[in-house]
Regions:
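Conserved acetyl-CoA-binding loop-helix of GNAT-fold acetyltransferases
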Residues: 77, 83-96
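Short amphipathic alpha-helix that is part of the acyltransferase structural core
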Residues: 1-31, 126
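A short helix-loop-beta-strand connector motif used in the catalytic cores of GNAT acetyltransferases and
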Residues: 37-48
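Active-site/acyl-donor-binding loops of N-acyltransferases
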Residues: 121-132
Length: 132
């Protein structure tokens, strides 16, 4: 079994996070590098997962008011480490820190079964950027 550690994000983690984003094809986060870096610096929820001997292999980033809502902006695990329960561990870690909040997130259709398996249910939402 792999030994992992969840810890608070540090600025020195950013380049590795961007590598994971690039490998996943999340080009918007990679191309908007400075905006993404600022997003991490301004996030109230920002944790990484380290695997022993391999460094950062995943992360979770979000925003919360600490009482009612916690919004997950991104949750991503390196492809080599998926299926080991790391994403589940990150979600549980965050929910333990903010037990009174409901967690909300947008997710891809391919991750639906993962989130439903963790007890999350679909909800309806909207999205718009200023340029639209």
């Amino acid at each position: 079994m792999i030994k992992i550690k969840i810890r608070q994000y540090q600025e020195t983690d950013f380049n590795r996070i961007q590598e994971i984003n690039r490998e996943e094809g999340w080009s918007n986060l990679v191309e908007r590098n400075e905006d993404t870096k600022q997003a991490w610096e301004n996030s109230t929820v920002s944790f990484v997962v380290e695997a022993e001997g391999d460094g950062v292999v995943g992360y979770i980033r979000g925003l919360t008011d600490t009482r009612t809502t916690l919004y997950i902006c991104e949750l991503l695990i390196d492809k080599k480490y998926r299926g080991l329960g790391i994403g589940k561990d990150l979600l549980q870690h965050v929910h333990r820190l903010y037990p009174k909040t409901r967690i909300e997130m947008l997710a891809s259709s391919t991750s639906r079964s993962f989130y439903e398996g963790q007890g999350y249910r679909p909800f309806y939402g909207f999205r718009k950027t200023l340029e639209e």
